[in-house]
Amino acid sequence: MLSDLYEEIKLRKTQPKEGSYTNYLFEKGLDKILKKVGEETTEVVIAAKNNNEELISEITDLTYHLLVLLAEKDIPLEDIKQELQSREGKLSKTSDRKEINDL
């Protein structure tokens, strides 16, 4: 499903459709896309404190905007899949992770 959505988003980039929100984002450019990713990320954090339906909705919005960002930067979805696979099963010690300092 994500692959299909990503392909549709890429298609909008090369074959604009009048009135499409995806086209609007591409027309406005990277800064607008990044702004939306930031907004949606914040909304996910807030929704996580509320009910699951709201959280699901916000994660869906964030996922869509991340796919638009990938398409804007011409990063294949396959690259993300490969990166996730490369991390699968790898153990990480908290002492090796500088960003984790309050466990």
Curated annotation (Swiss-Prot):
CDD domains: NTP-PPase_HisIE_like (cd11534). It comes from Listeria innocua serovar 6a (strain ATCC BAA-680 / CLIP 11262). It is found in: Cytoplasm. It comes from the Bacteria. Pathway: Amino-acid biosynthesis; L-histidine biosynthesis; L-histidine from 5-phospho-alpha-D-ribose 1-diphosphate: step 2/9. It is an enzyme of class 3 (hydrolase). GO terms for biological process: L-histidine biosynthetic process. It catalyses: 1-(5-phospho-beta-D-ribosyl)-ATP + H2O = 1-(5-phospho-beta-D-ribosyl)-5'-AMP + diphosphate + H(+). The keyword Protein transport does not apply. Belongs to the PRA-PH family. GO terms for molecular function: ATP binding; phosphoribosyl-ATP diphosphatase activity. One of its GO terms (cellular component) is cytoplasm. Residues 84-103 are annotated as: Disordered. Its main location: cytoplasm. Keywords: Amino-acid biosynthesis, ATP-binding, Cytoplasm, Histidine biosynthesis, Hydrolase, Nucleotide-binding. Gene3D superfamilies: MazG-like. This is Phosphoribosyl-ATP pyrophosphatase. The lineage of its organism: Bacteria, Bacillati, Bacillota, Bacilli, Bacillales. Its EC number is 3.6.1.31.
